[in-house]
Amino acid sequence: MTWRHHVRLLFTVSLALQIINLGNSYQREKHNGGREEVTKVATQKHRQSPLNWTSSHFGEVTGSAEGWGPEEPLPYSRAFGEGASARPRCCRNGGTCVLGSFCVCPAHFTGRYCEHDQRRSECGALEHGAWTLRACHLCRCIFGALHCLPLQTPDRCDPKDFLASHAHGPSAGGAPSLLLLLPCALLHRLLRPDAPAHPRSLVPSVLQRERRPCGRPGLGHRL
Protein backbone atom coordinates (compact mmCIF):
# COMPACT_ATOMS: atom_id res chain seq x y z
CA MET A 1 0.00 0.00 0.00
CA THR A 2 1.26 3.42 -0.84
CA TRP A 3 1.27 6.39 1.44
CA ARG A 4 -1.83 7.78 -0.31
CA HIS A 5 -3.88 4.85 0.93
CA HIS A 6 -2.68 5.48 4.48
CA VAL A 7 -3.61 9.16 4.29
CA ARG A 8 -7.05 8.34 2.86
CA LEU A 9 -7.66 5.75 5.60
CA LEU A 10 -6.71 8.17 8.36
CA PHE A 11 -8.92 10.87 6.89
CA THR A 12 -11.88 8.49 6.69
CA VAL A 13 -11.40 7.29 10.27
CA SER A 14 -11.10 10.85 11.64
CA LEU A 15 -14.19 11.92 9.69
CA ALA A 16 -16.15 8.98 11.07
CA LEU A 17 -15.08 9.79 14.63
CA GLN A 18 -16.16 13.42 14.24
CA ILE A 19 -19.53 12.36 12.89
CA ILE A 20 -20.03 9.97 15.81
CA ASN A 21 -19.03 12.68 18.30
CA LEU A 22 -21.43 15.18 16.76
CA GLY A 23 -24.23 12.61 16.87
CA ASN A 24 -23.64 11.87 20.54
CA SER A 25 -23.56 15.57 21.40
CA TYR A 26 -26.85 16.15 19.60
CA GLN A 27 -28.47 13.25 21.41
CA ARG A 28 -27.33 14.52 24.80
CA GLU A 29 -28.58 18.05 24.11
CA LYS A 30 -31.92 16.74 22.91
CA HIS A 31 -32.32 14.53 25.97
CA ASN A 32 -31.41 17.35 28.37
CA GLY A 33 -33.74 19.78 26.61
CA GLY A 34 -36.61 17.32 26.81
CA ARG A 35 -36.09 16.81 30.53
CA GLU A 36 -36.00 20.57 31.16
CA GLU A 37 -39.20 21.06 29.17
CA VAL A 38 -40.99 18.31 31.08
CA THR A 39 -39.83 19.81 34.37
CA LYS A 40 -41.07 23.28 33.39
CA VAL A 41 -44.47 21.95 32.32
CA ALA A 42 -44.87 20.00 35.55
CA THR A 43 -43.89 23.03 37.61
CA GLN A 44 -46.37 25.27 35.81
CA LYS A 45 -49.19 22.76 36.29
CA HIS A 46 -48.32 22.43 39.96
CA ARG A 47 -48.42 26.21 40.41
CA GLN A 48 -51.63 26.70 38.45
CA SER A 49 -53.68 23.93 40.08
CA PRO A 50 -53.98 25.52 43.57
CA LEU A 51 -54.75 28.90 42.01
CA ASN A 52 -57.49 27.48 39.81
CA TRP A 53 -58.96 25.49 42.70
CA THR A 54 -58.93 28.54 44.95
CA SER A 55 -60.52 30.86 42.40
CA SER A 56 -63.22 28.37 41.40
CA HIS A 57 -64.19 27.52 44.97
CA PHE A 58 -64.01 31.15 46.04
CA GLY A 59 -66.49 31.97 43.30
CA GLU A 60 -68.79 29.18 44.45
CA VAL A 61 -68.64 30.28 48.09
CA THR A 62 -69.00 34.04 47.75
CA GLY A 63 -71.27 34.12 44.73
CA SER A 64 -71.50 36.97 42.27
CA ALA A 65 -71.14 40.62 43.18
CA GLU A 66 -74.82 41.30 42.47
CA GLY A 67 -76.05 38.49 44.77
CA TRP A 68 -78.39 35.62 44.09
CA GLY A 69 -81.83 35.32 45.60
CA PRO A 70 -83.79 32.40 47.03
CA GLU A 71 -85.91 30.36 44.66
CA GLU A 72 -88.92 30.43 47.00
CA PRO A 73 -90.20 33.16 49.36
CA LEU A 74 -89.33 32.72 52.99
CA PRO A 75 -92.24 31.59 55.22
CA TYR A 76 -92.82 33.61 58.37
CA SER A 77 -94.37 32.71 61.68
CA ARG A 78 -97.38 34.88 62.37
CA ALA A 79 -96.69 34.64 66.10
CA PHE A 80 -93.07 35.74 66.31
CA GLY A 81 -92.14 36.86 62.80
CA GLU A 82 -89.07 34.68 62.48
CA GLY A 83 -88.20 33.34 59.07
CA ALA A 84 -87.85 29.58 58.54
CA SER A 85 -86.16 28.53 55.33
CA ALA A 86 -84.98 25.03 54.50
CA ARG A 87 -82.48 26.37 51.96
CA PRO A 88 -81.00 29.71 53.06
CA ARG A 89 -79.68 31.76 50.19
CA CYS A 90 -78.31 35.28 49.60
CA CYS A 91 -79.61 37.91 48.66
CA ARG A 92 -82.74 39.73 47.46
CA ASN A 93 -83.45 43.21 46.15
CA GLY A 94 -79.91 43.80 44.93
CA GLY A 95 -78.15 42.85 48.15
CA THR A 96 -74.52 41.73 48.10
CA CYS A 97 -73.67 38.30 49.48
CA VAL A 98 -70.71 38.19 51.90
CA LEU A 99 -69.10 34.87 52.86
CA GLY A 100 -72.14 32.97 51.67
CA SER A 101 -74.17 33.81 54.81
CA PHE A 102 -74.58 37.57 55.19
CA CYS A 103 -76.19 40.22 53.03
CA VAL A 104 -75.21 43.85 52.63
CA CYS A 105 -78.53 45.49 51.79
CA PRO A 106 -79.03 48.63 49.68
CA ALA A 107 -80.95 51.65 50.93
CA HIS A 108 -84.54 51.16 52.20
CA PHE A 109 -84.10 47.38 52.52
CA THR A 110 -83.43 45.34 55.64
CA GLY A 111 -83.63 41.78 56.96
CA ARG A 112 -81.32 38.80 56.74
CA TYR A 113 -81.88 38.44 53.00
CA CYS A 114 -82.79 42.10 52.26
CA GLU A 115 -86.37 40.94 51.80
CA HIS A 116 -88.10 43.75 53.74
CA ASP A 117 -88.77 47.15 52.21
CA GLN A 118 -88.83 49.82 54.92
CA ARG A 119 -90.91 52.09 52.70
CA ARG A 120 -93.83 49.64 52.93
CA SER A 121 -94.60 49.61 56.64
CA GLU A 122 -97.79 48.34 58.27
CA CYS A 123 -96.75 49.49 61.74
CA GLY A 124 -97.21 53.23 61.43
CA ALA A 125 -95.22 54.93 64.18
CA LEU A 126 -94.25 51.65 65.86
CA GLU A 127 -90.60 50.68 65.80
CA HIS A 128 -89.17 47.28 65.03
CA GLY A 129 -89.92 44.83 67.86
CA ALA A 130 -92.68 46.94 69.47
CA TRP A 131 -95.94 45.34 70.67
CA THR A 132 -99.44 46.74 70.17
CA LEU A 133 -103.10 45.70 70.50
CA ARG A 134 -104.86 45.65 67.15
CA ALA A 135 -108.50 44.48 66.83
CA CYS A 136 -108.38 42.39 70.03
CA HIS A 137 -105.13 40.76 68.87
CA LEU A 138 -101.73 41.27 70.46
CA CYS A 139 -99.40 42.13 67.56
CA ARG A 140 -95.70 42.79 67.14
CA CYS A 141 -94.00 44.92 64.51
CA ILE A 142 -91.30 42.93 62.71
CA PHE A 143 -89.45 44.71 59.89
CA GLY A 144 -92.43 46.88 59.01
CA ALA A 145 -95.03 44.06 59.15
CA LEU A 146 -97.51 43.28 61.94
CA HIS A 147 -97.48 39.69 63.18
CA CYS A 148 -100.38 38.97 65.54
CA LEU A 149 -100.98 36.28 68.14
CA PRO A 150 -104.24 34.30 68.17
CA LEU A 151 -107.26 35.89 69.81
CA GLN A 152 -106.75 36.00 73.59
CA THR A 153 -109.66 38.20 74.78
CA PRO A 154 -112.79 37.14 72.86
CA ASP A 155 -115.18 39.19 75.04
CA ARG A 156 -113.12 42.21 76.10
CA CYS A 157 -110.42 44.09 74.20
CA ASP A 158 -109.14 46.29 77.02
CA PRO A 159 -105.37 45.81 77.53
CA LYS A 160 -105.96 45.79 81.31
CA ASP A 161 -108.38 42.89 80.94
CA PHE A 162 -105.86 41.09 78.76
CA LEU A 163 -103.18 41.43 81.42
CA ALA A 164 -105.59 40.49 84.20
CA SER A 165 -106.56 37.28 82.40
CA HIS A 166 -102.99 36.03 82.84
CA ALA A 167 -102.88 36.72 86.59
CA HIS A 168 -103.26 33.93 89.15
CA GLY A 169 -106.05 35.61 91.13
CA PRO A 170 -106.56 38.47 93.60
CA SER A 171 -105.05 36.56 96.53
CA ALA A 172 -101.78 35.81 94.79
CA GLY A 173 -100.08 38.95 96.11
CA GLY A 174 -101.65 38.79 99.61
CA ALA A 175 -99.71 35.79 100.93
CA PRO A 176 -96.27 37.55 101.05
CA SER A 177 -97.77 40.53 102.92
CA LEU A 178 -99.31 38.21 105.53
CA LEU A 179 -96.02 36.42 106.00
CA LEU A 180 -94.23 39.73 106.59
CA LEU A 181 -96.84 41.02 109.02
CA LEU A 182 -95.91 38.79 111.99
CA PRO A 183 -92.12 39.55 112.00
CA CYS A 184 -92.85 43.27 111.74
CA ALA A 185 -95.23 43.09 114.70
CA LEU A 186 -92.68 41.17 116.77
CA LEU A 187 -89.98 43.71 115.98
CA HIS A 188 -92.30 46.54 116.90
CA ARG A 189 -93.07 44.95 120.27
CA LEU A 190 -89.38 44.35 121.02
CA LEU A 191 -88.55 47.99 120.42
CA ARG A 192 -91.20 49.25 122.83
CA PRO A 193 -89.80 50.45 126.20
CA ASP A 194 -92.35 48.42 128.20
CA ALA A 195 -91.63 45.14 126.32
CA PRO A 196 -91.32 41.99 128.54
CA ALA A 197 -87.97 40.39 129.19
CA HIS A 198 -88.80 37.03 127.62
CA PRO A 199 -89.47 37.08 123.85
CA ARG A 200 -91.62 33.95 124.09
CA SER A 201 -94.32 35.87 125.89
CA LEU A 202 -94.59 38.18 122.89
CA VAL A 203 -96.15 35.64 120.59
CA PRO A 204 -99.57 35.29 122.30
CA SER A 205 -99.87 39.04 122.79
CA VAL A 206 -98.96 39.77 119.18
CA LEU A 207 -101.40 37.19 117.93
CA GLN A 208 -104.14 38.65 120.12
CA ARG A 209 -103.31 42.09 118.79
CA GLU A 210 -103.51 40.91 115.21
CA ARG A 211 -106.88 39.28 115.86
CA ARG A 212 -108.24 42.52 117.35
CA PRO A 213 -110.29 44.56 114.85
CA CYS A 214 -108.41 47.63 113.68
CA GLY A 215 -109.69 51.15 113.51
CA ARG A 216 -112.50 50.74 116.10
CA PRO A 217 -112.53 53.37 118.87
CA GLY A 218 -112.70 52.48 122.52
CA LEU A 219 -110.37 49.48 122.38
CA GLY A 220 -107.01 49.61 124.11
CA HIS A 221 -103.95 47.40 124.22
CA ARG A 222 -103.82 44.57 126.67
CA LEU A 223 -100.32 43.48 127.66
From Swiss-Prot:
Gene3D superfamilies: Laminin. A lipid is attached at residue 158 (GPI-anchor amidated aspartate). One of its GO terms (biological process) is determination of left/right symmetry. Glycans are attached at residue 52. Keywords: Cell membrane, Developmental protein, Disease variant, Disulfide bond, EGF-like domain, Gastrulation, Glycoprotein, GPI-anchor, Heterotaxy, Lipoprotein, Membrane, Secreted, Signal. Residues 159-223 form a propeptide. GO terms for molecular function: activin receptor binding; nodal binding. One of its GO terms (cellular component) is plasma membrane. Residues 86-115 form the EGF-like domain. This is Cryptic protein. The keyword Ribonucleoprotein does not apply. N-glycosylated. It is linked to Heterotaxy, visceral, 2, autosomal: A form of visceral heterotaxy, a complex disorder due to disruption of the normal left-right asymmetry of the thoracoabdominal organs. Visceral heterotaxy or situs ambiguus results in randomization of the placement of visceral organs, including the heart, lungs, liver, spleen, and stomach. The organs are oriented randomly with respect to the left-right axis and with respect to one another. It can be associated with a variety of congenital defects including cardiac malformations. It comes from Homo sapiens. It is found in: Cell membrane; Secreted. Residues 1-25 form the signal peptide. Disulfide bonds join 90-97, 91-103, 105-114. Its main location: membrane. PROSITE patterns: EGF_1 (PS00022), EGF_3 (PS50026).
